[in-house]
Amino acid sequence: MSVLQVLHYPDERLRKIAAPVKEVNGEIQRIVDDMFETMYAEEGIGLAATQVDVHLQIIVIDVSENRDQRLVLINPELLEKSGETGIEEGCLSIPEQRALVPRAEKVKIRALDRDGKPFELEADDLLAICIQHEMDHLVGKLFVDYLSPLKRQRIRQKLEKMAKLNARAN
């Protein structure tokens, strides 16, 4: 397994729409494993393939405290959503920035697992929020897209400043 490079906003590759996975095979499973390795290394709770410049409908999630409840969603489909909630969300592609984003409180999805087997899942709370956040990535949407243009511009400026400082340090 290897740690992949996470794309950072405003990189336009984050806006690409992911294609469905045609066949779950060894290559797809390797991508899934590398995505988990990357997510854990970056201390995230979810990662969409788009964020590592792989434009396929693959999501990995682990919201557990012990980091031992891996969830793989290949070709996920939202079947139902209900209620309203929101927390301050962060994103590995938008480092050190957080914002309150409105989300459905509960979701029901259908997807394929790491072995290509179909399943349905009902989720609520943090898991439901994480699923919605990662599914947004698959259609080129970021949490900053829910914010006002002014807030979005501020975040962009902060990230550009951070990138310049990091470039000088290296």
From Swiss-Prot:
Binds 1 Fe(2+) ion. Belongs to the polypeptide deformylase family. It is an enzyme of class 3 (hydrolase). GO terms for biological process: co-translational protein modification; translation. Keywords: Hydrolase, Iron, Metal-binding, Protein biosynthesis. One of its GO terms (molecular function) is metal ion binding. This is Peptide deformylase. InterPro entries: Peptide_deformylase, Peptide_deformylase_sf. It comes from the Bacteria. Its EC number is 3.5.1.88. The active site is at E134. Removes the formyl group from the N-terminal Met of newly synthesized proteins. Requires at least a dipeptide for an efficient rate of reaction. N-terminal L-methionine is a prerequisite for activity but the enzyme has broad specificity at other positions. Fe cation binds at C91, H133, H137. The lineage of its organism: Bacteria, Pseudomonadati, Pseudomonadota, Gammaproteobacteria, Enterobacterales. It comes from Yersinia enterocolitica serotype O:8 / biotype 1B (strain NCTC 13174 / 8081). It catalyses: N-terminal N-formyl-L-methionyl-[peptide] + H2O = N-terminal L-methionyl-[peptide] + formate. Its cofactor is Fe(2+).
